[in-house]
């Protein structure tokens, strides 16, 4: 599960650590890959992958990559703007806004991203591959594609009331 740390106002979550190997003439060379998620709990979130011969070095590289790779998410209070389906590779993630008090109903990788972003009420379901890297990327694709009614109205040149119907 995700390991959580607070650092300079950012919530850092460790999603997964995997041991990988490279086969050479003399045998195998083992190294570690880490997948981390970083967020401020207020709509900014990023993810990163790091690879090194030691676990702490891989985690540190992943955290630095996550801080460089942050996006801003338009939230509707403590939930999402609208239901969204996003995919990356064979992973598909469905995210739906939920009423106050519902909580974050999500699996490990999706939960880490949404909690780091500051989402408090959401329903999610993963379909297809549950590879943590692809699930995190699919979640990011969904959050990036989500737009507020204000943005949609400005893009179409209409009022927010016309958009919401």
Swiss-Prot record:
It comes from the Bacteria. Transmembrane segments: none annotated. The gene is rpsE. Belongs to the universal ribosomal protein uS5 family. It holds the Pfam family Ribosomal_S5. Keywords: Ribonucleoprotein, Ribosomal protein, RNA-binding, rRNA-binding. This is Small ribosomal subunit protein uS5. One of its GO terms (cellular component) is small ribosomal subunit. With S4 and S12 plays an important role in translational accuracy. GO terms for biological process: translation. Coiled coil: none annotated. Residues 10-73 form the S5 DRBM domain. The keyword Ribonucleoprotein applies. GO terms for molecular function: rRNA binding; structural constituent of ribosome. PANTHER family: MITOCHONDRIAL RIBOSOMAL PROTEIN S5. NCBIfam families: rpsE_bact.
